[in-house]
Design a protein with these regions (language model features):
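Gly/Gly-Pro- and Ser/Thr-rich, intrinsically disordered tail segments characteristic of DNA damage-repair
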Residues: 1-220, 226, 269, 350-397
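DNA-contacting surface of Y-family translesion DNA polymerases
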Residues: 178, 186-326
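Short, compositionally biased low-complexity segments
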Residues: 54-61, 91-100, 228-240, 284-288, ...
Length: 397
């Protein structure tokens, strides 16, 4: 089963504020002509306003489009409420993003109710526990891929199933790029092999698909389209990172440091919450001119303290060759290992550092982000706003 919250951020705003209901609204990164639209309400979508558009494009399509800036705390709260509802039916679920969940009910008591009955009850629970304006589209199928495909057949508030008796009819009504994972380049690659429709895709031999994709990925597509589950693998976390698109064209190192500090603190909080430490640190910069630069460093020992990560990131950023206005600044860490493999040093200094970092994290988790932190964070208060990535939900608790 796949559950998709319709028009996520926009619908949550309409649920919270009755005056927004029935109106075309959009949540954008910035309320400026160049701001990117993150979510548009169902009313706005009907007028052609889509995710990824610029605010000025949306207003050309809908002159009375109301633009709101994101409220991440509100969206995280709703996401956690969704988790609580789903957990009542099955512990076997995976948040695919802030607004999507994949569920496996096999072997759970709720499975005896039937998938459609469970879907209807989840919809009802959402109305009662979260809000009557919130709608979800639910897809049911033999595997995750087809369940997601089913969830978008009749948006909003849909409930559809793809099974052995209707899949050909549904495939016939879809375009290749309607399938999650098939973008323009993949569609062009398939066309070179004489595959133009989803039914062509389904009828193709496994060997032909392997040739078309130049990899084993073609065989995986062969299995997906036939209902085999191959996407249930929970790949190990390889890195953590945070990035920020600057609203102002900073280029001096001293102007970028408060932003780098805050990004590093946010990254470390997620790293610690997930129970990891890291050996590698990296910085990436995309400039307004289109230039891109990145640099990494791998250390012999693992790093845990935010201050150590920041020191390393600061040194790397100082090596950037371009003196141009920055568009996006990113800090990331890699070479992860679980903190339960901790080996104490002779004098116990590292153990104290770990405990201090964990204590700061616990205080911030309870009382709010950056209640405790480096003084330089204060300089970035009005520069780095709280943001939430659609896929950044692993660490939410």
């Amino acid at each position: 089963m796949h559950i998709d919250l319709n028009s996520c951020f926009a619908t949550i705003e309409q649920q919270a504020n009755r005056q927004l209901r029935g109106r075309p609204i959009a949540v954008a990164a910035y309320n400026s002509p160049g701001g990117c639209i993150l979510a548009s309400s169902i009313e706005a979508k009907r007028l052609g306003v889509k995710t990824g558009m610029r605010v000025q494009e949306g207003k050309l399509l809908c002159s009375d489009l109301l633009i709101l800036e994101p409220d991440p705390a509100k969206y995280r709260c709703v996401h956690l409420q969704f988790r609580e509802i789903i957990n009542c039916y099955t512990p076997e679920f995976s948040p695919k993003s802030i607004d999507e969940f994949a569920l496996n009910l096999e072997g759970c008591p709720a499975f005896k109710l039937g998938m459609h009955e469970v879907a209807k009850r989840i919809k009802c629970d959402i109305k009662n526990a979260i809000g009557d304006y919130i709608t979800v589209s639910i897809g049911i199928a033999p595997n995750r891929f087809l369940a997601k495909a089913a969830s978008v057949l009749h948006k909003p508030d849909g409930l559809d199933e793809i099974h052995a008796y209707n899949f050909k009819e549904i495939y016939a009504g879809l375009k290749l790029q309607d399938l999650c994972g098939i973008a323009a380049n993949s569609a062009a690659r398939l066309a070179e092999s004489g595959i133009y429709t989803v039914m062509d895709f389904y009828n193709a031999k496994a060997s032909d698909l392997i040739r078309a994709f130049h990899s084993i990925g073609g065989y995986y597509w062969y299995l997906r389209l036939r209902g085999w589950e191959i996407d249930a693998v929970d790949f190990a976390r390889k890195s953590f990172g945070n990035s920020y698109a600057l609203p102002k064209p900073f280029w001096k190192l001293e102007d970028l440091l408060p932003i780098l500090q805050k990004l590093t603190e946010k990254m470390c909080f997620r790293l610690h919450t997930s129970g990891f430490k890291a050996r590698g640190v990296g910085v990436a910069v995309r400039y307004k001119t289109g230039n891109f630069w990145h640099k990494t460093r791998l250390y012999a020992d693992f790093i845990y303290k935010p201050g150590d990560f920041f020191t390393s990131a600061f040194k790397l950023l100082g090596l950037a060759p371009y003196k141009e206005p920055v568009h996006t600044l990113t800090v990331f860490c890699f070479g992860l290992i679980k903190t339960d493999t901790f080996q104490p040093d002779l004098f116990g200094v590292e153990e104290k550092n770990y405990k201090l970092a964990d204590a700061v994290d616990a205080i911030n988790a309870k009382w709010g982000n950056f209640v405790l932190g480096p003084a330089s964070i204060l300089l970035s208060k009005d520069l780095v706003k709280d943001r939430i990535a659609f896929g950044g939900v692993r660490e939410l608790t």
